[in-house]
A protein has these predicted regions:
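A glycine/threonine-rich phosphate-anchoring loop and its flanking beta-alpha core
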Residues: 88-185
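Gly/Ser-rich catalytic serine loop of serine hydrolases
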Residues: 72-78
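ATP/NTP phosphate-donor binding region
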Residues: 1-69
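Short Gly/Thr/Asp-enriched flexible loops that form oxyanion-binding sites at enzyme active sites
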Residues: 78-92
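Short glycine-/acidic-enriched loop or helix-start segments at secondary-structure transitions
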Residues: 34-37, 81-83, 105-106, 140-141
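Short beta-strand/turn micro-motifs composed of small residues
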Residues: 26-27, 74, 131
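Active-site segments that bind and position negatively charged phosphate/pyrophosphate groups
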Residues: 175-267
Length: 267
């Protein structure tokens, strides 16, 4: 089932006003500064998040007020925090990405840090996902461009997936592989718009995220888009103890790993 993904200008306020019941808002000061004040004012509580450490997330789950919905407005950290709280509480979830630097708004599993390492937990569906282009376009252009990294990873992910399939360590699906390749080729065709951070590019990135997520659910694993480039990123963060802009780090990993693979690095 495709998610209820809504894309347009100035649509966030209407989407939140349609909710039946009350809500807890999870965000950060930066993203919330560009949002209609009526949205935080109507929330049962507004909760800031600054970490994906499991202990921090569990503390939020224990402390936030009871509500019918969790609404997340922000970047990848906010998306995963809101997903975690909604999953643990068993309540409905609304996600409104303020940036397209990472695919967290359309994925169902939840990224968290456990003992300093990125792991994935749970399964939750946001209904709806509200991609308000007015809000997203207000984010720094560099960060919106970074979103391409979580899609370019198809270049190296598919290569590694095929290697794994030949070694009988992962299931392969020709149709899903072909669909993933189409997503990648469309991304290259959109490169000028992505560089200019046009509305067309922002919508393309968020819809491509949703398409890829559907493919991963169908095949039952992340092989089509998560390979050595992602593991490079995880290793860098584990070794440095730092977080980086996810799309930029994965983009770097894709460039490096495609060179090692002999797999279209010049693109």
């Amino acid at each position: 089932k495709r998610p209820d993904l809504r894309v347009g200008h100035g649509i966030l306020g209407e989407a939140v006003s349609e909710l039946r019941g009350d809500y807890v808002l999870i965000s950060q000061p930066g993203p919330l500064a560009h949002v209609d004040p009526a949205i935080p004012e109507a929330a049962v509580a507004t909760v800031w998040t600054d970490s994906l450490d499991e202990d921090h997330l569990d503390a939020l789950v224990a402390s936030v007020p009871v509500a019918d919905h969790v609404v997340g407005i922000g970047g990848g950290m906010v998306m995963d925090t809101a997903k975690y709280v909604a999953w643990k509480r068993g309540v409905r979830l609304v996600l409104a990405p303020s940036i397209v630097s990472v695919d967290a708004s359309v994925t169902n599993t939840i990224a968290l840090r456990r003992d300093g390492r990125v792991e994935y937990e749970g399964f939750v569906v946001a209904e709806p996902i509200v991609a308000d282009l007015t809000r997203i376009a207000s984010a720094p252009a560099r960060l919106n461009r970074a979103g391409v990294g979580d899609l370019l990873s198809i270049q190296t992910g598919r290569f590694d997936w095929a290697l794994g399939a030949r070694a009988n360590t992962i299931a392969f699906d020709d149709r899903v592989d072909a669909e993933a390749e189409r997503v990648l080729e469309a991304l290259y065709e959109m490169s000028a718009d992505i560089a200019a951070v046009t509305d067309r590019a922002l919508e393309h990135i968020i819809r491509a995220y949703a398409t890829v997520n559907a493919l991963l659910l169908e095949v039952g694993h992340s092989g089509p888009e998560e390979g050595s480039e992602h593991y490079f990123g995880y290793a860098v963060e584990a070794a440095t103890g730092r977080s980086f802009v996810h799309g930029e780090l994965i983009g770097l990993g894709t460039v490096l790993m495609s060179g090692l693979q002999g797999n279209g690095q010049d693109r």
